[in-house]
């Protein structure tokens, strides 16, 4: 189980060399969060990694709040594309 970083960046980039826009960062965090969620279904007592998961969720929330404040239309498109609730 690993993340295909290049395809995630390719699907969410805003320009040709974009790797750091909020959309890309949120998409990468979402992929890592989904991967860790599957991990916790098997390893229920892995509390050390659970802390990292919570940090990722909080980081994603911050980036989404920023994007919502800066450009609401991009925010709505990203939420719909990634299938996130809000």
UniProtKB/Swiss-Prot annotation:
HAMAP family reported in the protein's UniProt record: Ribosomal_uS15_B
Assembly: Part of the 30S ribosomal subunit. Forms a bridge to the 50S subunit in the 70S ribosome, contacting the 23S rRNA.
Record PANTHER family: RIBOSOMAL PROTEIN S15, BACTERIAL AND ORGANELLAR, SMALL RIBOSOMAL SUBUNIT PROTEIN US15M
Polar residues biased stretches: 1-10
Similarity comment: family membership: Belongs to the universal ribosomal protein uS15 family.
Gene Ontology cellular-component terms listed: cytosolic small ribosomal subunit
PROSITE patterns in UniProt: RIBOSOMAL_S15
Region of interest: Disordered: 1-21
Originating species: Xylella fastidiosa (strain M12)
InterPro entries xrefs: Ribosomal_uS15 (IPR000589), Ribosomal_uS15_bac-type (IPR005290), uS15_NS1_RNA-bd_sf (IPR009068)
Protein name: Small ribosomal subunit protein uS15
Domain of life: Bacteria
Pfam families cross-referenced by the UniProt entry: Ribosomal_S15 (PF00312)
Any one GO BP annotation for this protein: translation
A GO MF term: structural constituent of ribosome
Annotated keywords: Ribonucleoprotein, Ribosomal protein, RNA-binding, rRNA-binding
Described purpose of this protein according to its UniProt entry: One of the primary rRNA binding proteins, it binds directly to 16S rRNA where it helps nucleate assembly of the platform of the 30S subunit by binding and bridging several RNA helices of the 16S rRNA. Forms an intersubunit bridge (bridge B4) with the 23S rRNA of the 50S subunit in the ribosome.
